[in-house]
Swiss-Prot record:
Sigma factors are initiation factors that promote the attachment of RNA polymerase to specific initiation sites and are then released. This sigma factor regulates the genes for a membrane-located efflux system that confers resistance to nickel and cobalt. CnrH alone is able to activate CNR expression, while both CnrY and CrnX are needed for nickel induction of cnrH. Binds DNA in an RNA polymerase-dependent fashion. CnrH may be controlled by a CnrYX transmembrane anti-sigma factor complex which binds CnrH in the absence of Ni(2+). If Ni(2+) appears in the periplasm, it may be bound by CnrR (CnrX); the signal then would be transmitted by CnrY into the cytoplasm and CnrH would be released. It comes from Cupriavidus metallidurans (strain ATCC 43123 / DSM 2839 / NBRC 102507 / CH34). The keyword DNA-binding applies. Residues 156-175 bind DNA. The gene is cnrH. The keyword DNA-binding applies. A motif (Polymerase core binding) lies at residues 49-62. This is RNA polymerase sigma factor CnrH. Disulfide bonds: none annotated.
Amino acid sequence: MNPEDADRILAAQAASGNQRAFGQLVARHGVALAQAARSFGIPETDVDDVVQDTFVAAWHALDDFDPDRPFRAWLFRIGLNKMRDLYRFRRVRQFLFGAENLGDLELAGGVANDEPGPEQQVAARLELARVASTLGKLDTGSREVIVLTAIVGMSQPEAAAVLGLSVKAVEGRIGRARAKLSALLDADSEK
């Protein structure tokens, strides 16, 4: 039996609630999924989480799996989406909290634990609320480029295609939007 057929059988068994069959799918594809995550640049500290999130999502979506298509491709599509989610989350944190690189976010608190303390969580929520309300004060064009690139995670060419602009126009709007946002946030801080 070829691997694709074995995957189809295991997926069908798992979809009917057979956890052992799903465990075999995890064993068959977990290492390759982790290697893919590393190749996409996912930090080692997040690889296991991405793999676990992928398999949890796959377990919940087994009824949607089309047995006429390869299970591995379906699973890796879910994994790729989880990796993109992680990048989006980190990009938003980086943009909103101004870390020079994503590693600075974990080191900024000066503690070994990655989990922020209660004071840091409250401060982060307050800062996020402040930035979100300030985004609403930007003109539509500025808000669109910031949301598409910094929050949704689109590249400048993707944002340009969505907005019907040239890449240079998007670059210019991003620069102006960041300057406006920074000025609004500074003015808000002085109040």
